[in-house]
Amino acid sequence: MSAPEEMTLKVIAHIRTAFPTKFGIPRQSGLVDSLRGEVIFTPEYRNADAVRGLEDFSHIWLVWQFSGAVRDSWSPTRMGVFATRSPFRPNPLGLSSVQLEAIEHRPDVGPVLIVRGADLMDGTPIYDIKPYIPYADCHPDAAAGFTAQTQFHHLTMVCDAGLWA
């Protein structure tokens, strides 16, 4: 028996973040640990049993859709589509590792995952959540391809306190 060539994914949750548009979102998860988000489950998964045991993990994987960057085609440039993390993909799915800060049980929406370091736009559909397992998910000797040349720059922002009044 062979697997089908296509499948339908079910949205299990949406994330609430401070980013109403794609502009300003960090390019990778974990780059800005202070960014807080809330994963709100769809009614079918608003059940404490769905997250039982997740509280024992410090990090989780979010599988999500690039809902704000959908395009029919990919235009090749310097790298092939599968050598990049571009949102313009045959299947516009994203994968983010985020810190699980807490699980709050709210009477109106059930369990809510409080996460840090998410790189997702507000309202992004979540298709799956998996625990981050350090011995299997971390590969310290992994080759980084073209990203090994990435330079990190720290910026200091100075703002007149009078502007906040």
Regions of interest found by a model, annotated:
Residues 1-97, 101-165:
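Glycine-rich, low-complexity intrinsically disordered segments
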